[in-house]
C-alpha cells in the first residue's frame, strides 16, 4: 500500500497495515513538517483509544519512506508552525546548532514554508536544508537504539504526556 499523507490518516493507515495479516507492507510519503522530520523515522503506529494517547498500536516499519520537502509549500501556516515547534523541541534537547538556525531564520522559515514557497531566498533554502537534515539525523540517533520503546526515558518524549 502507498500512503502519501501525514497525521491521523497516515497513522491509521499504517496501523491497519500492521493489523491486517499481521504485517501488510506499505510505503509512506509524509507531507507535513512533523511527518517528514518525526514520523518518517518512527516505526510506531499507535492510535488513541478511550482518552489515552497511542493506547492501541504496533511497531511496523515501512518497506520504503520517500521524503519530498516540496509538499511543505502546500501547507497552511498553522501546519508549518506545528512542525517548527517539533523542530524546536528536538533541537533544544539534542542539537544546539540547529536550534540557533531555527532562532535566526524563524519568521522566514514559517513565511516561506521552510524555503519551499516561490520566491524564497537561497539563504533560507540552505538553512532549511541544514535544519531538516539535522532534525532527521537527531531523530534517527535518538530512535534507533530504542525503536520499540522498551526504555521509556526518551529525550524525544519531552512534552508528551
Regions found by a protein language model. Give the residues of each.
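Hydrophobic aliphatic residue packing
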Residues: 7-9, 29, 47, 143
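Generic hydrophobic-segment detector
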Residues: 3-4, 36, 58, 125, ...
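Active-site segments that bind and position negatively charged phosphate/pyrophosphate groups
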Residues: 110-161
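Short, flexible coil/turn micro-motifs enriched in small/turn-prone residues
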Residues: 2, 9, 34-37, 52, ...
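Anion-binding (especially nucleotide phosphate/pyrophosphate-binding) glycine-rich loop
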Residues: 1-23
Amino acid at each position: 500500500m502507498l500512503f502519501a499523507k501525514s497525521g491521523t490518516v497516515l497513522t491509521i493507515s499504517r496501523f491497519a497495515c500492521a493489523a491486517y495479516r499481521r504485517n501488510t507492507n506499505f510505503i509512506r510519503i509524509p507531507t507535513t513538517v512533523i511527518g517528514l522530520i518525526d514520523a518518517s523515522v518512527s516505526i510506531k503506529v499507535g492510535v488513541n483509544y478511550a482518552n489515552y494517547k497511542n493506547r492501541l498500536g504496533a511497531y511496523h516499519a515501512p518497506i520504503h519512506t520517500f521524503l519530498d520537502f516540496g509538499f511543505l509549500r502546500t501547507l497552511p501556516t498553522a501546519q508549518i508552525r506545528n512542525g517548527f515547534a517539533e523542530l524546536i523541541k528536538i533541537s533544544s534537547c539534542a542539537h544546539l546548532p540547529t536550534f540557533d538556525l531555527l532562532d535566526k531564520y524563524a519568521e522566514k522559515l514559517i513565511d516561506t514554508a521552510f524555503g519551499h514557497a516561490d520566491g524564497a531566498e537561497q539563504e533560507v533554502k540552505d538553512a532549511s536544508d541544514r535544519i531538516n537534515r539535522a532534525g532527521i539525523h537527531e531523530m534517527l540517533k535518538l530512535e534507533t537504539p530504542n525503536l520499540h520503546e522498551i526504555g521509556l526515558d526518551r529525550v524525544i518524549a519531552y512534552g508528551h504526556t
